């Protein structure tokens, strides 16, 4: 379905409810620049470097796009998805079933989730929705539950510290969304709905959190304006 949620009756505050879940795939493909290309980059990299039967847990898996891509790349992967939205998980499970894929899903608040040891954790556009006081604690848990030489892939919308640059990047992003078919009204309405829900950090703040959690080797593998993907290695 096409995302027209903010066309007439803007939501007071953004949440991943049934209305969002029903249009999520269209929404994210039109709202996150190079979403599919970045998803494939990360998936192909993991498929290339991970050992047989590697376990991968997608934290904030939404409609399972990344997990489904991974499952089709390597049949030996052990795949898990966690999300706090029942509506999003309903879509994820339906898609996995339609493709005949064996993916385990958990409905949980990530800050309260009973983590288990994995080779890879993925947090694509997830940390930005976690309340700031809880982010470091969550990253600490992720690091603790990674196997030796484990990997975290983390994609985030980021802030620029320079006000002039930030203003112009935000305007370029709005231009991008207009080219994807969103009206100025829809863009403004969604921005208002996301205020105090999606709280981005700067690149430096994200790197500091990763380092504080214990990651020593951190690289940026994708960036477009105010969107960036980090890969961090344990040990």
From Swiss-Prot:
Claim: Nuclease is one of the keywords in the record: no
For the keyword Transport, the answer is: no
| Cystines in this chain | none
Q: Which GO terms describe its biological process?
A: tRNA wobble uridine modification
Q: Which GO molecular function, any one, fits this protein according to its record? A: carboxyl- or carbamoyltransferase activity
Alphabetized InterPro entries for the sequence? CmoA, Methyltransf_25, SAM-dependent_MTases_sf
Q: Which family does it belong to?
A: Belongs to the class I-like SAM-binding methyltransferase superfamily. Cx-SAM synthase family.
| PANTHER family registered for this protein in UniProt | CARBOXY-S-ADENOSYL-L-METHIONINE SYNTHASE, TRANS-ACONITATE 2-METHYLTRANSFERASE-RELATED
This one is known as Carboxy-S-adenosyl-L-methionine synthase
């Amino acid at each position: 379905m096409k995302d027209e949620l903010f066309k007439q009756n803007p939501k007071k505050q953004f949440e991943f409810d049934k209305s969002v879940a029903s249009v999520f795939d269209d929404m994210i493909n039109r709202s996150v620049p190079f979403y599919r290309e970045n998803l494939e980059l990360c998936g192909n990299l993991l498929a290339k470097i991970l050992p047989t039967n590697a376990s991968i847990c997608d934290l904030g898996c939404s409609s399972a796009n990344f997990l489904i891509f991974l499952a089709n790349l390597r049949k030996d992967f052990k795949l898990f998805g966690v999300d706090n939205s029942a509506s999003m998980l309903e879509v994820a499970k339906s898609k996995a079933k339609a493709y005949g894929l064996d993916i385990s899903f958990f409905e949980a608040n990530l800050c309260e989730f009973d983590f288990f040891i994995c080779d890879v954790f993925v947090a694509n556009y997830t940390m930005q929705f976690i309340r700031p006081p809880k982010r470091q604690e969550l990253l600490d848990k992720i690091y603790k539950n990674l196997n030796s030489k484990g990997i975290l892939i983390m994609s985030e919308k980021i802030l620029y510290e320079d006000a002039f640059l930030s203003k112009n990047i935000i305007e370029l992003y709005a231009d991008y969304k207009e080219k994807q078919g969103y009206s100025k009204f829809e863009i403004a309405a969604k921005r208002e709905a996301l205020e105090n829900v999606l709280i981005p950090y700067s690149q430096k703040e994200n790197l500091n959190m990763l380092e504080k959690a214990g990651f020593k080797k951190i690289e940026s593998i994708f960036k477009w304006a105010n969107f960036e993907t980090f890969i961090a290695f344990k040990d």
